[in-house]
């Protein structure tokens, strides 16, 4: 991998955007994965702009991204993009930094190692099979809501060995309202529309439960609902200990059981939320794209019939479902749940001759990178074969569905295994077509979601 240093030739001059334009659109539009606010960043590998007095650099060349996430990673930390996550889930693997992050990540790595995850396949399959069995042939339903409930049941069963109860039914509404409020809060912090001290104080108030007025009160109420739910899960385990090697027991026994209760709560809530939200979105986009591409779907159904027939999948089957896996990878390229990430420079840096001053927020528009024709020929075409051909000249940071660098999502193997199982089990019994009159609309909050769901009709095979 080539490095992004001053010794390499420039890929081109930095594009500069109007401060007034970017500030106005940050206030009025917010995030937009398409042609709006971030759409203006297309057409250049590096773009400089200011927003309400804060410096930003957007980088969309994989070499530049590689530099920030790998080569010069010690010069960059998580930005205010993660403020709403801190407000809800406190200090955790998503929001922590430095030695504390490394220590906590190390304590949890073995839980998400492939050899351990293979033993969770049965625990993943049970809730997926239950949801599939409850589907009504010919009935129209919102696949996104179904995926939220399914992925939450999988997380509850496989990682917590518990039933989340009523939270499963209410999570779709909680997540939708919470993410929309979080996007507005993030807009104030990330784009510099509010002084950082004020922003950080609001984050602390939401997290600590200090009474706040609307609309912050709604986000706080959602946080308190989730707080009660996850504390109930922890209390139940403490009252009725088990010998299972699930995530909750790992959290409670980490470092000899000396993690503070609040840290256990924060990590458990993070895995509950992040463990279902991004996967639910990824699966919703998968079913949407498969409905639009019947040839790819038919190829997948043939593979499933050949490998599985109608029997229950096993861990050994997962590696045999190459086309199914490629379809999931391509859908994550086309609509990446994690569609943008940001880092803040804590030291001066140089990227390919471009100076990055300390305090600059570096934006990585994953959605744009995933649709760059230099790395993905004919990028608007759904082509799972890209992931079977695997050209050797594609940069490693041209594909970032789980982020990259040492901060890459710890649960990526868990998520991929879960997605393959969902695609396989549900497709053994049903095909899903878009409901008449349905049109998708993207909603770019902290994650990329279908704004009005994905309305489908399931037809029994």
UniProtKB/Swiss-Prot annotation:
Gene3D superfamilies: Cytochrome P450. It is an enzyme of class 1 (oxidoreductase). InterPro entries: Cyt_P450 (IPR001128), Cyt_P450_CS (IPR017972), Cyt_P450_E_grp-I (IPR002401), Cyt_P450_sf (IPR036396), Cytochrome_P450_Monoox (IPR050196). Its EC number is 1.14.-.-. Heme binds at residue 409. The keyword Oxidoreductase applies. GO terms for molecular function: heme binding; iron ion binding; monooxygenase activity; oxidoreductase activity, acting on paired donors, with incorporation or reduction of molecular oxygen. This is Putative cytochrome P450 132. It comes from Mycobacterium bovis (strain ATCC BAA-935 / AF2122/97).
């Amino acid at each position: 991998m080539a490095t992004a240093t001053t010794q390499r030739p420039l890929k081109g001059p930095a594009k500069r955007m109007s401060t007034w334009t970017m500030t106005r659109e940050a206030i009025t539009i917010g995030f937009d994965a398409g042609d709006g606010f971030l759409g203006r960043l297309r057409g250049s590998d590096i773009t400089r702009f200011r927003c309400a007095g804060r410096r930003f650099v957007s980088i969309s060349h994989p070499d530049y991204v590689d530099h920030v996430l790998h080569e010069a990673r010690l010069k960059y930390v998580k930005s205010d993009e993660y403020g709403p996550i801190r407000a809800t889930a406190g200090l955790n693997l998503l929001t922590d930094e430095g030695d504390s992050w490394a220590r906590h990540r190390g304590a949890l790595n073995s839980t998400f190692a492939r050899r351990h995850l293979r033993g969770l396949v049965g625990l993943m399959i049970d809730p997926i099979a239950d949801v599939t069995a409850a589907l009504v042939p010919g009935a129209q339903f919102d696949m996104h809501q179904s995926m939220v409930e399914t992925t939450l049941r999988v997380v509850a069963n496989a990682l917590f060995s518990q039933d989340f109860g009523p939270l499963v039914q209410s999570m779709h509404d909680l997540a939708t309202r919470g993410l929309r409020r979080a996007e507005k809060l993030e807009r104030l912090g990330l784009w510099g529309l509010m002084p950082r001290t004020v922003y950080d104080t609001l984050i602390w108030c939401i997290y600590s439960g200090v009474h706040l007025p609307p609309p912050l009160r709604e986000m706080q109420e959602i946080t308190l609902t989730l707080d009660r739910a996850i504390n109930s899960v922890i209390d139940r385990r403490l009252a009725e200990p088990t010998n299972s090697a699930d995530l909750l027991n790992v959290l409670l026994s980490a470092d000899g059981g000396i993690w503070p209760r609040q840290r256990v709560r924060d990590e458990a809530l993070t895995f509950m939320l992040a463990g279902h939200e991004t996967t639910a979105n990824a699966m919703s986009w998968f079913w949407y794209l498969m409905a639009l591409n019947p040839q790819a779907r038919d190829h997948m159904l043939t593979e499933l019939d050949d490998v599985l027939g109608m029997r229950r999948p096993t861990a050994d089957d997962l590696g045999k479902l190459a086309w199914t896996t490629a379809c999931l990878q391509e859908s994550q390229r086309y609509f990446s749940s994690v569609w943008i990430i940001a880092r803040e420079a804590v030291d001066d840096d140089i990227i390919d001759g471009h100076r990055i001053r300390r305090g600059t927020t570096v934006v990585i528009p994953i959605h744009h990178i995933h649709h760059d024709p230099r790395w993905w020929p004919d990028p608007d075409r759904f082509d799972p074969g890209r992931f079977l051909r695997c050209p050797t000249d594609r940069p490693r940071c041209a594909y970032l569905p789980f982020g990259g660098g040492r901060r890459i999502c710890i649960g990526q193997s868990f998520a991929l295994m879960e997605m393959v199982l969902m695609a396989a089990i549900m497709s053994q019994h049903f095909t899903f077509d878009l409901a008449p009159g349905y049109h998708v609309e993207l909603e770019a909050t902290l994650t990329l979601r279908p704004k009005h769901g994905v309305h489908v009709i399931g037809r029994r095979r």
